[in-house]
Amino acid sequence: MENKGLTNTNDAAYQKLIDNITTLWGEAKSKAITAINTELLDANWQTGKYIVEYEQGGKQRAEYGKRLLVNLAKDLTARNGKGFNRTNLTYMRKLYLAFPKCGTLSHKLTWSHYYELLKCDNTLEMQFYYKESIKECWKVRELKRQMKSCLFQRLALSTDKAGVLALANEGHQVQTPQDIIRDPFVLEFAGLPKQKRYKESDLEKALKDHMEQFLLEMGRGFAFVGRQYSMQIGSRQFKVDLVFYHCILKCYVLIDLKRAEIKHGDIGQMNLYLNYFKTEVCQPDDNPPIGIVLGARKDELLMEYALEGITNQLFVARYQLYLPKREELQAQLDKLLDETKDSI
């Protein structure tokens, strides 16, 4: 006779045995993951500490500068494998600078949480999302969503702070005037009254108005060409937000404004526009066009890689002399953040 089993699966004691073992292994896995996260976070912090201490070790090391992380990435990867690319090392360094004392790191958050938090340009903003992530037990995806929706800035500007937090905790995407659409970068940049509510299209129009006026008033050779400049590329229609011609540099300047974080695709799209201008718009005696992608947040490494293609060093020097520096443009967007300390 075939033995189909030694136990009765309907037996309560047997079901309890299954439940106990399942619970045991679930807790064990959870503890293991927590332990791994703790060790990973501490190791990343310590790595950042080593890098900063090395940088501060003397003048010669300081002059080693930007090549340090590039060389470290190559050598550490060769010896230890993946996980030590330049971007990761940059964020490990940022982690130490943001949290100089290891004891202030909360192990309730993962390295992926800190990776997103360290993208904040403003310490106050980072601390806000840091505390909210712990308090509300946000997963990484939820943290990214809240940051993208500019929860910190909307909360700082709103008189109904509890209402804004309630909307955020409900997972509600702010998309209409009734949802308190208030982007602090746009409001400050465009000089709009804070008490009024605007549609997203109104805010973007005001932002472009202000950017256009800002560049023209700088008196550095900018001539306005057009807004929402249309380009037919293949079978598709594209539009770039603002186009200027720089009379001193003898080149077109294309500007794309992004309300959220600048993505790799935004840089690629700008490169597409630049190639179009080189082929279809520029005259033989024009210099290559310049593209500026401006957003609420930026990844310095991404921006650096995106500008790698400029090889004419003389042209780059004139670019730095006559065009507004990246910091000048970003300052126009970030200005309000300095005024929010007393608002929260």
What are these regions (language model features)?
Residues 1-344:
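Basic, low-complexity intrinsically disordered segments
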